[in-house]
Each structure stands twice: as C-alpha cells, then as structure tokens.
C-alpha cells in the first residue's frame, strides 16, 4: 500500500498533521501531534496497514517550510507549555534553532517516520 503526502499542501507543522489526517486516516479524528503520529505509524489501530510506503512529494519545499523558522515557532510554543524537567533541553534546542543550528521540524519528522521499520519513506522532489 502507498500513501502520498503533498508538501505543497502544508506550510507548518499543524498543516502537516492535517495532511497526515487527510492521507493516512481519511479525515478521521486523531490527536494531531508528534506522539499521536508515532502511535499511528506504529500501527495496530486498524486505520492503516501494518506495512506501507509513504511518499513525501515536494520534500524540498517541506524542508524549507518546516525549517528553522517553523522550528523556532514550535520550540517557543513548547517552552511555554513544557514540563519543568524539559525546560533546559527545550531552551537549548531553541537557542540552537535561533542560530540556524540543530535539527529542524522537517528533520524531526523524517527521523520519526524512518524509525518505523514497517514504513518505507520516500522523499521526492516534485510530482
């Protein structure tokens, strides 16, 4: 089974989650966050096959849109809401992102998806 995410359909992490919902779970309600995406990719919910190929079209556009500007936005939000034990780690990650260093939101997502042996991720530029 193949699913196709279209990088032209999202400009930020929240819109990425909406695209995942549209493509992988056909608009069914899901929590639309990093942990829920991890759970969804792990499978066992009956929403998607246990093994599948995920094609991410316009990946280079996504790399730009989910780059350091979006990473700073996400980490700033996390810093406001994070558990006190995560405060220093999040602050350091934000500091790095403000300098254009460290992993971006795009990197977070690629790593998360790639950690699932049941998912074959293909990053494709263009259609």
Predicted regions located by residue number:
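Positively charged, polar, low-complexity stretches
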Residues: 1-127
């Amino acid at each position: 089974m193949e699913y196709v995410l279209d990088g032209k359909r999202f400009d930020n992490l929240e819109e990425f989650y909406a695209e995942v919902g549209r493509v992988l779970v056909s608009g069914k309600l899901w929590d639309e966050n990093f942990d829920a995406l991890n759970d969804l990719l792990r499978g066992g919910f009956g929403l998607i096959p246990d093994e599948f190929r995920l094609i991410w079209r316009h990946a280079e556009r996504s790399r730009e849109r989910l780059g350091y500007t979006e990473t700073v936005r996400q980490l700033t939000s996390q810093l406001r809401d994070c558990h006190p034990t995560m405060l220093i780690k999040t602050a350091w990650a934000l500091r790095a992102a403000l300098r254009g260093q460290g992993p971006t939101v795009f990197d977070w997502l690629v790593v998360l998806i790639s950690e699932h042996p049941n998912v074959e991720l293909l990053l494709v530029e263009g259609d």
